[in-house]
Amino acid sequence: MSHGETRLTDCRIPASNIIGKEGKGFILAQERLGPGRIHHCMRWIGICERAVGLMCVRASSRELRPNKFLSEKQTIQNWISESAAAIYGARLMVLDCAKKIEVHSTKGARKEISMIKFHVADVLMKVLDRAIQVHGALGMTDHTPLSFWYRHERGSRIYDGADEVHKSVVARSILRDQLD
């Protein structure tokens, strides 16, 4: 897995190795979370694109009966187009957020950072779910990367702040802006 855990007990750090001011580590870490969340979101968008590619290959090759393919079903076509539109929108949101961080700093893009975090994670889970559904039982096996991605990336809605926390940040910001 991509996340490890390290426990340090009675660890002493020489003063020359301290980054930033003593006692201000959380603030420093918060400054790095925004760009880190952009990284996660772009990685999730890449997974979404791969999942749509696998979904298209499977739908185009899965024969329901002679010369009748799964890709001809309107529901499957809807899933493909909805997934593509969601990915496109997610990418634009992430690029806009990155620009805001560049221009206004992480603090100035706090609302947008929270929006991309929960929105792109939601897009990821929906796209993976559709791709698994198109693959049928095969999608639940390790013969494709889909089930691994689904299991591994389900945490996207929890780590780095649960969706509900980020939605609360966004709502409070919007309420504050609307009431000013």
Features from the language model and the residues they span:
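Alpha-helical interface subdomain recognition
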Residues: E5-C11, K24, Q30-D180
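Cytochrome P450 core scaffold surrounding the K-helix E-X-X-R motif
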Residues: N17-E22
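Gly/Pro-rich active-site capping loops and adjacent beta-alpha segments
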Residues: S2
